[in-house]
Amino acid sequence: MDSLFVEEVAASLVREFLSRKGLKKTCVTMDQERPRSDLSINNRNDLRKVLHLEFLYKENKAKENPLKTSLELITRYFLDHFGNTANNFTQDTPIPALSVPKKNNKVPSRCSETTLVNIYDLSDEDAGWRTSLSETSKARHDNLDGDVLGNFVSSKRPPHKSKPMQTVPGETPMLASAWEKMDKLHLEPSLDVKRMGENSRPKSGLIVRGMMSGPIASSPQDSFHRRSLRRSLPSSSSTQPQEESRKVPELFIRTQQDILASSNSSPSRTSLGQLSELTVEKEKTTASSPPHLPSKRLPPRDRARRRDPSEDTLAVDSSTDADRMPLKLYLPGGNSRMTQERLERAFKRQGSQPVPVRKNQLLLSDKADGELGTLRLEDVEDELIREEVILSPVPSVLKLQTASKPIDLSVAKEIKTLLFGSSFCCFNEEWKLQSFSFSNTASLKYGIVQNKGGPCGVLAAVQGCVLQKLLFEGDSKADCARGLQPSDAHRTRCLVLALADIVWRAGGRERAVVALASRTQQFSPTGKYKADGVLETLTLHSLTCYGDLVTFLQQSIHQFEVGPHGCILLTLSAILSRSTELIRQDFDVPTSHLIGAHGYCTQELVNLLLTGKAVSNVFNDVVELDSGDGNITLLRGIAARSDIGFLSLFEHYNVCQVGCFLKTPRFPIWVVCSESHFSILFSLQPGLLRDWRTERLFDLYYYDGLANQQEQIRLTIDTTQTISEDTDNDLVPPLELCIRTKWKGASVNWNGSDPIL
């Protein structure tokens, strides 16, 4: 197995631990110092499957205080079952050690290997069983590829020729009963192992081959090679070339009649004292055998995840403990005593139906893995699983078509001039510390929290797009109210889609540029430019496919959600996707800029995020303004119906006129501009803007990320009861005035909430 894959799986375990523990800043730091790769696993269910932790996960869920992370599950498993490994085997006499010389095949060494190998020589009187237990006290963990913790992916080893197994009499009734039940259900056949060239010989006792009388030092490579000799590659041909045998072994799911091969036997192995192998035979015949499923054409990652066939080898442990079976059968996957106990418990719980054995599980998963590009539907037991999904899944096969380059000084100058009107200006602290973090208040989990004033226009626009995804797209369409109680994973997913829509729309639905921060400075500020510590570190990623854009944002969503510069990164991404040239063409006055005094968002910036164009007005289409001297000035407005609407207090004061493209959007969500602040207003009724009868009496929900809301604000709008416009405006909340620019004279009931004045 590739060490890179092992490293990525381990890193994914750490990321999952950090994510579940809420260590968001640590996650960001880890992603920056150790970026994800194509081998990274970013979905908790996938990670659990790679490590085969399904059984531990189910057991954990049944506990009163379940653990939250896979790393904790693994840790508890080892502490519970292998903390006292040395006590599992009592030693009354000195145990000889065995050394196996190196072979020509070079195998990697392990620093954790012991240099002495312990051999337990059990006599033939023990019911005819003979077993060799190697490295029991120090290297028991090497065989932890069992059913419980799950068949760790084996390393790349040279394959060996197959050999049959032999029958050993003396099975206990319980063990025989277990095999009979497995036979009836056509589950996994018994896997027999025998040395090459030997005939089947029914015996009660077997000879321990290669025993030496004294302790002999053995290198880590020797002990590692001994284990590799116990692995095997089943193949349809015994004349496989040596060059081909050095490749990654191909795994076949064999029929019930097939015999699993064991390690290749050689004269040196017999004469130099290789560990003897237990041979057990159970002959089975069944007509319903699964076909061969070679993994030859699967991608490297999928091949790496397949188990070595030797992990299906049966090992038997003889024990005299009162609380254990006299004869223990270790099912495919390694020497974990929990496997037998699980099998026995399963027989008692399910009657005659044993738990599915590892090979059948592997067959099903291999079929699914073999169909690249298809989504695998999983059995979801409860809603908790949805919350455990770690976002940012990186595709293992598909490569993103991304062109990346660092920002340069000229681009940074253009952006700053477009934002502030001068390259000497910088983002203030309100902008630098603002990202798209969600509220932890139970009734406001859908809301993005604003730290201070300034980028409220960007936050409101993103909030509207997130609500669009939460309420009216995907599975939320059937139950909009449920969309207001999203899981952490679901709301983050909706944030990804919202950001993707914004930058894709700004790029004319043809391209997008995503600006991400790095830990290195990309250029040295010189001349008429003032550094702010943000633009100088950017890397610009160009994409021309919407699907790639969504996937790319999933991988980097921490920079937007956790920050610290998420708001700045989105603003710059929208600008670069649109391009500075086209944005200046959108302006009525070419010298306009996107951020006004005190760091407030301009109407141009809000329009850029909502419609993809940084026009200066909110009316429909284009207005020709005749100055009277023959010169006509074109004032650009909104060109088409927007997904998210816009209402303004300025319209109440007759300063501007919001057109129907913004006032009647596709979705009942409006960004509200009131007294230099942007907030959000939305409805849960998707047909509110399509059926005039629903506009007689309906509810609107109000959210202000800066108002420190602690509860949901629900307004009931009644258009059948009109309010006189002559009412003293000083006592009327500005929000009501904004609402009446859309529904003239409507009454607004705050339903017990304090009106925001």
From Swiss-Prot:
The EC number(s) this enzyme carries: 3.4.19.12
InterPro entries: MINDY-3/4_CD, MINY3/4
Ranges of compositional bias, category Polar residues: 254-277
One GO-annotated biological process of the protein: protein K48-linked deubiquitination
Catalytic reaction equation(s): Thiol-dependent hydrolysis of ester, thioester, amide, peptide and isopeptide bonds formed by the C-terminal Gly of ubiquitin (a 76-residue protein attached to proteins as an intracellular targeting signal)
Region (Disordered): 141-170, 192-335
Compositionally skewed regions (Low complexity) per UniProt: 231-242
Catalytic site positions: C456 (nucleophile), H677 (proton acceptor)
Record flagged with keyword Phosphoprotein: yes
Protein task: Probable hydrolase that can remove 'Lys-48'-linked conjugated ubiquitin from proteins.
Keywords: Hydrolase, Phosphoprotein, Protease, Thiol protease, Ubl conjugation pathway
Family from the record: Belongs to the MINDY deubiquitinase family. FAM188 subfamily.
Transmembrane domains' residue ranges: none
Regions of compositional bias (Basic and acidic residues) in chain numbering: 192-201, 299-310
Location of Phosphoserine modifications: S219, S223, S289
Domain of life from the UniProt record: Eukaryota
Pfam families listed in its UniProt record: MINDY-3_4_CD
Disulfide topology: none
GO molecular function terms listed in the Swiss-Prot or TrEMBL record: cysteine-type deubiquitinase activity; K48-linked deubiquitinase activity
Name assigned to this protein: Probable ubiquitin carboxyl-terminal hydrolase MINDY-4
Provenance organism: Pongo abelii
